[in-house]
Amino acid sequence: MNIFIVGPMGSGKTTVGKIVASELFLDFYDTDGTIEEKTGVTIDWIFDIEGEGGFRKRETLVLKDLVALNSIVLATGGGIVIEDENRELLASRGTVFYLHTPLNTQIERTAKDKDRPLLKNKNASEVLINLQNARQFLYEEVSDYIIDTENKSGSEVAKEIVKLVKNYG
C-alpha cells in the first residue's frame, strides 16, 4: 500500500505524512527532501541555478524512483501535479490524498518560512492565489480523497487519513 499526499505549500503534507507513516508502520519519504539528499544542495539552490524547469525534471526523476517502492507514505512538493506524467505515476501506484487548505492558512504557514523558492522576493499572497488557481483542479483530478485541513492540526488530518486507509484500503 502506498499513500501519496498532495496539496499546496503550507498544507502540512510533510507533517501529516510523517504521522500517517508512523501510525501505519510505513516508511516515510518527501520528494523535496529526497531531491536535497540526492543532490547535496537545497531546493532553493536548484531553483536559483537551474530554474523551475530544472527542478521539475529532477522532481519527476525522484518521483519515478519513489513510486516504485512499496508500503510508503510520500509527501510531494506542491507543484508535482503540474506534469501529466507525475499525476499518472501517482494515480497508478497508490492512494492519493489532497490536503485542501484555505489560502489564509497557507499564507499564515508560509509567512515565516524563508525556504520557499516560489515565494522568494515576491508578494506571497498574490503568488499563492495564482498557484491555487493554476493547480487546484490538478490536485482534485489526481486525488482519491480530498481532506479539508481548515482549523485542524496535523495529527487531526493524519487521523482522518489513517481512518480512511483502514476502512477503505
Regions picked out by a protein language model, each given a short descriptive name:
Residues 8:
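P-loop (Walker A) phosphate-binding loop of NTP-binding proteins
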Residues 5:
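Hydrophobic anchor at the beta1->P-loop junction of P-loop NTPases
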